[in-house]
Amino acid sequence: MFWGYSLSFGTDINGLIGGLDFIGMAGVGMEPHATIATNLPHMVFMIFQCMFAIITPALITGAFAERMRFSAFLIFIVLWCTFVYAPLCHWVWGGGWMFKMGALDFAGGAVVHMSSASAALAAALVIGKRKGWGKRSFLPHNLPM
């Protein structure tokens, strides 16, 4: 929200990433933007896009379950959203090179689902099996408790 929206929907920089126009939500108000979602308030569009930015890393969590410390997972999510999700979002939805080539992504098929599936598969392959898998039975647990 502080920089991701700007990197995704800021002024196009060579089709690769958005500029820092909206960093810290600067210029995001209740008036419609001139080029981004011209039929609804800019703030509403930003919140709608935040929903996708939240759901996408949540889909990856299944690959990390019981394989990574929560603090490491949070660091991964911040880095992944900055260096993977934001550029991909800009490419497809924010006026980047794929958008200019005519790519259409309805309901997040490429930006959300393909990126989270690729990240989850890569993470599962890199991290490997859970510690103790096949050697002992796992005790049930509840993370919030």
Q: What are these language model-derived features?
A:
Residues 1-145:
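Hydrophobic alpha-helical transmembrane bundles of multi-pass membrane proteins
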